[in-house]
Amino acid sequence: MSKEAEMSIAVSALFPGFRFSPTDVELISYYLRRKIDGDENSVAVIAEVEIYKFEPWDLPEESKLKSENEWFYFCARGRKYPHGSQSRRATQLGYWKATGKERSVKSGNQVVGTKRTLVFHIGRAPRGERTEWIMHEYCIHGAPQDALVVCRLRKNADFRASSTQKMEDGVVQDDGYVGQRGGLEKEDKSYYESEHQIPNGDIAESSNVVEDQADTDDDCYAEILNDDIIKLDEEALKASQAFRPTNPTHQETISSESSSKRSKCGIKKESTETMNCYALFRIKNVAGTDSSWRFPNPFKIKKDDSQRLMKNVLATTVFLAILFSFFWTVLIARN
């Protein structure tokens, strides 16, 4: 370690207010770049640690610069599988879960690297409990998957206070925030080791399955909705409901559910296409099952209809005759 690095560490330890707080660009362009180039003296203030062999509350002890809520490390981003594309991010008691997308770090108009945010969860995915430990992973632009990265570890001091307040207010968050009982104390460490002892392989495998499943849920759902058979059944059902009486309340419920599904999946169909689908569906299914089925003949009049028609014609004739006689009588009386 150089004299400048030793002096920086000594100053930060002795004098309050002196902090090591580099920007994202400085971490990538200066520290990570010089570390990769082999200039160890310029980056001696940052320790090289295999982060995923430690729990987050144990990492502050491995840092060269002591702090209360922020620490820095160099780490090789290993592969989860020899020929896989996923990184190894599981520890003995939990796993680091990536949140959001990988963001670009720019120096002016030039992209110098990428930044990814990870949150530590205790337990197995997808039922892990989120903690206040957050890590930002910085990588040089265009580096391979298993390249060296620099990590900024942070402890969210407001996490426990906000979780306690929301529990008192009766609010349960969707992401399952649970206040971490760990810390830097030995008693809390023993609690995690006794209650959350989990093999690394199981955590890595379950985390991999959940991430892959989450990435493909939307695509699978969209492919199912775009299937021609399901489209035909859906449109035929809607059209058939328009031709038979239904309970108004039930009809409103079906209509609201159908409209919500269409708005969610982005399916837009015109009324003409609906009627065409229904006609094809009826011809294919009804005609296929009953060979004697034919379209009704509008000119074929039943016997009951002909009798009713004759009665109507006779009644009309009698009414016109009475009306004509009345007017004829009035006309003769005036003359």
Swiss-Prot record:
Domain of life where this protein originates: Eukaryota
Q: How does it sit in the membrane?
A: Single-pass membrane protein
Name any GO cellular component annotation.
plasma membrane
Keyword check for Magnesium: no
Induction cue: By high salt stress. Repressed by gibberellic acid (GA), but induced by the GA biosynthetic inhibitor paclabutrazol (PAC). Accumulates transiently in seeds upon imbibition. Induced by drought stress.
The residues the entry assigns to the signal sequence are none
Q: How is it modified after translation?
A: Proteolytically cleaved, probably by metalloprotease activity. This cleavage mediates a translocation from the plasma membrane to the nucleus.
Entry keywords, A to Z: Activator, Cell membrane, DNA-binding, Flowering, Gibberellin signaling pathway, Membrane, Nucleus, Stress response, Transcription, Transcription regulation, Transmembrane, Transmembrane helix
Give the knockout phenotype: In ntl8-1, no discernible phenotypic changes except slight differences in lateral root growth and flowering time, as well as reduced lateral root growth rate. Insensitive to high salt.
Q: Which residue ranges hold the DNA-binding region? A: 112-162
Subcellular location(s) per record: Cell membrane; Nucleus
Question: Compositionally biased, Polar residues: which spans?
Answer: 245-254
User: What tissue expression does the UniProt record report for this protein?
Assistant: Expressed in seeds, leaves, roots and inflorescence. Expressed in roots, rosette leaves, cauline leaves, shoot apex, stems and flowers.
Q: Name one GO molecular function term.
A: DNA-binding transcription factor activity
Q: List the disulfide bonds.
A: none
Q: Which residues cross the membrane?
A: 313-333
Q: NAC domain: which residues?
A: 14-156
Q: Where is this region: Disordered?
A: 245-267
What is one process in the GO biological process aspect for this record?
A: flower development
Instruction: Please classify the protein's predominant subcellular localization into one broad category.
Output: membrane
What is written about domains in the entry's comments?
The NAC domain includes a DNA binding domain and a dimerization domain.
Q: What is the stated purpose of this protein?
A: Transcriptional activator activated by proteolytic cleavage through regulated intramembrane proteolysis (RIP), probably via metalloprotease activity. Regulates gibberellic acid-mediated salt-responsive repression of seed germination and flowering via FT, thus delaying seed germination under high salinity conditions.
Q: What is this protein called?
A: NAC domain-containing protein 40
